[in-house]
Amino acid sequence: RETMENLLLTIDPGTVDWSRAQFALTAIYHWLFVPLTLGLAVIMGIMETCYYRTRKEFWRSAAQFWQRLFGINFAMGVATGIILEFEFGTNWSNYSWFVGDIFGAPLAIEGILAFFMESTFVAIMFFGWSKVSAGFHLASTWLTGLGATLSAWWILVANAWMQYPIGCTFNPETMRNEMTSFFDVALSPFAIDKFTHTVTSAWVLGAAFTVGVSCWYLLRKRHVELAKQSIKIGSIVGLVASLLAASTGHESAYMVAQTQPMKLAAMEALYEGGNSQSLTGIAMVNPFSQPDYMNESEPPMRVAVPNMLSILATKSTTGYVPGVRDIIKGYTKADGTKEPSLKEKQERGKRAIQALKDYRAGKDKETNKKILDSDMKYFGYGYIKDANQLVPYIPINFWAFRTMVGLGCLFILVFALMLFILYRKDITRPRWLQYLGLALIPLAYIASESGWLVAEFGRQPWTIQDMLPTWAAVSDLSSGGIAFTFFLFLVLFTAMLTVEISIMCKQIKKGPAL
């Protein structure tokens, strides 16, 4: 491969759009299963711990009930996850070539270490109740959850590297980015923040699912004791996890402000930045338009919390937060350094692209290598032709962020209310609360998917931040072929989801063997 120029000259825009749509479809369906796996792992681990300590048959039956639901969901998550990983090679081969040496490492570790670990212990967890000691079985249950969490860690390390690429260098001889520090990649601050926020939010979803199913039992006046104990454990886990998710979300917002300021500007619909910026609670942001951002006015009817955006982005009430136009024009950071304008980044990106061509052609390699070392971090900007290409779709980012945060606050209130009524009153009586608990299940999924919409829409147009735009990362495939597989996957995934929901509902209706 000489450069990406030939691909960019011949690529069908439909190929890019359908490739993105197919990957988004697979990721959305996959993420319906993953957070419930992570969340239920904690719930069933706690219940089996109660059985191990008390040896009461009630806790054994309760743990086995939630483990059955965990197992159904786990199987679906594995199936969709395998398809998701294969799409990097089929639809995004240019990306795989460009950074495969780095991106492939955490995925390989996830498959070899974490997945095999959870696969081994999940078998003991399901089939070892009467074959191994109670202590070994308890350890297997917790290790299954740990394995699932480690899988999430390595996947999120890979995703975080795409949004904050560190620990690597570009080799013009091979036309590939190569890892220079595994620990920089694996332990980057972006990866740590993404992991803690994602996993704690998954615990919230698992707790919401537990409380929701238990409230359904209360509405039907079935398995009341299981429902009460499950609501107790689910609400405690949910409240703690919700508070942790809020805290880690604050840290994630701070990291985004430092590394992806355009994403933060899109989340806030902030066109003109400044000091002491307020955080918008709600504003009239048109959900159907993609305006000319250099001339767009601020959204009307903005209701905001004073100074809160500056606190999130800079941890200071007076901190400077750049808006869309500031980022495009260039601005001065808090540490006094100058962030180059889009025009300067484009020039340096084009210079890097030309230097790479000349290097590959054997022209003055030493000089061109120095240019690449200096300007490679702006390589992707050489493919940006218009300022509006640099701005992610603001309406989706704006509303998805508020949906996530608003529901997160609601979860804190509902879990706290559940615990209050559980300890002070009879939770089997207020039916409105039981319906509210049941509603937590879809609301938790909406919040979880909204968070990923912010993360992935917000980093556009980049596949790898500042290095590789989305349209330069795709495979040279026909848009018609990708469209066909998109609808094929849509039917397949919908059928899988329908089957899972059907099996889960049957198991829930059947209830525990008490």
Which role fits each region the language model picked out?
Residues 4-28, 55-62, 86-108, 160-196, ...:
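Membrane-interface interhelical loops and short amphipathic "cap" helices
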Residues 34-43, 113-121, 202-213, 403-419, ...:
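Hydrophobic alpha-helical transmembrane segments
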Residues 54-72, 98-104, 108, 128-146, ...:
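Membrane-interfacial loop-to-helix junctions in multi-pass inner-membrane proteins
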Residues 71-80, 142-165, 238-249, 359, ...:
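Hydrophobic alpha-helical membrane-insertion segments
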Residues 73-143, 160, 457-461:
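Membrane-interface helix-loop-helix modules in multi-pass inner-membrane proteins
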Residues 123-131, 136-142, 153-162, 182, ...:
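Internal alpha-helical transmembrane segments
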Residues 158, 240-347:
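Aromatic-rich transmembrane-lumenal/periplasmic boundary elements in polytopic membrane proteins
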Residues 389-452, 483-507:
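C-terminal substrate/ligand-recognition segments
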